[in-house]
């Protein structure tokens, strides 16, 4: 774990919202007691998003004004356990979340494997500036620890895609692929760093010795590495209404199918199988007519809310 307080500051643009992604693995036995005061400080400052609290730490993404985010982060870092919290910042042209939720969980990122503790055993952090050299090494096997709907829109060159539906499937995928031991180095990455950090702890437990992970995840890489030097291909899926970001953490061109939650390209929107809010190329064949009619009713409510200048919670 890191033991320094740091932040990536980006110049504020009028009318934009600041988005802060954060996580910290640390023993936090009083996590349940922190939920209400954390929810209160978020609500008081107009901050929205989701924060997860568990015995193993904190994880989440929030958005708001510069001042609002600063107030929430100050509250979190005022807890001795989170004094060394690192967060990553990006911008959104509109508020990317509908509400603020502080939730209590068994794990801040769910792997479902007992006794995996990144606070005790973890892989070696690799700074974004050193990542290209590592993954270009023929002795390195690069593994994406994200889910299939995320990897569908972007990957590092040469990365292995486990095509998991959830992070819970990752341990089984590792156990079923003995060929992963064929190369001496394993390099892992994810969106912001939390999944690959926990995954490296699992890999070490499985007997892999030389395990690395991208510090700060794809987001930090896209922030720091210019496009002309980048080995990233595509866009990075994010879990808010921006849907994706690209180099410089600029908002991508993807939208989300509100029926199946799959990211869509502008080309996907032109498909005859696409009906806004109802179906897309990914889910058209899996929906019944009853499903479609229910989604159409929801979409009508969303459009009515937009006309009133409001936002429908189902959007």
UniProtKB/Swiss-Prot annotation:
It is an enzyme of class 1 (oxidoreductase). It catalyses: uridine(34) in tRNA + AH2 + O2 = 5-hydroxyuridine(34) in tRNA + A + H2O. Its EC number is 1.14.-.-. It holds the Pfam family Rhodanese. InterPro entries: Multihaem_cyt_sf, Rhodanese-like_dom, Rhodanese-like_dom_sf, TrhO, TRHO_N. Residues 136-230 form the Rhodanese domain. GO terms for biological process: tRNA modification. One of its GO terms (molecular function) is oxidoreductase activity, acting on paired donors, with incorporation or reduction of molecular oxygen. Keywords: Oxidoreductase, tRNA processing. PROSITE patterns: RHODANESE_3 (PS50206). The active site is at residue 190. Catalyzes oxygen-dependent 5-hydroxyuridine (ho5U) modification at position 34 in tRNAs. Belongs to the TrhO family. This is tRNA uridine(34) hydroxylase. It comes from Rhizobium meliloti (strain 1021) (Ensifer meliloti). The gene is trhO.
